[in-house]
Design a protein with these regions (language model features):
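Metallo-beta-lactamase
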Residues: 1-103, 110-122
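Conserved nucleotide-sugar donor-interacting segment of glycosyltransferase catalytic cores
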Residues: 125
Length: 125
């Protein structure tokens, strides 16, 4: 688990899942220039891109922010046991997100503020 300190504030990344995106790289990035993309294979493969399946490897995670006064959860990921057949990666998800949150030292009842960067289904669990 990664944690950064910014003054007296700590920021911890809480992983929900990391893996291949549901669509090919060109679908995720419609203006993708393949020649320019392939130049970056040395650092992208295998942790950020799967060339055999043409899938970007993406991460879904929350940020646990502790200010000393407040405990803030930024984005709540996709969430478990949701009907999302149009998004196979998130359909009926079953991951130990709450265990990871507790491992970082916060239970759901410890959160003072929940913030969502935007309201896509992978951010509002």
């Amino acid at each position: 688990m990664q944690t950064w300190s910014i003054g007296s504030t700590t920021v911890t990344r809480i992983e929900e899942q990391i893996g291949p995106n549901d669509m090919p790289a060109g679908g995720f990035l419609p203006k993708l220039d393949r020649a320019r993309f392939e130049v970056h294979y040395p650092w992208m493969v295998p942790t950020h891109y799967d060339p055999a399946n043409d899938k970007l490897i993406t991460s879904n995670h929350s940020w646990l922010i502790r200010t000393g006064t407040h405990t803030i959860l930024l984005d709540t990921c996709a969430g478990n046991h949701k009907e999302r057949p149009w998004l196979p990666r998130f359909h009926q998800l079953d991951v130990p997100f709450l265990s990871r949150l507790r491992e970082a030292g916060a239970a759901p009842e410890d959160i003072d503020i929940v913030m969502c960067t935007h309201l896509h289904s992978d951010h509002v669990g």
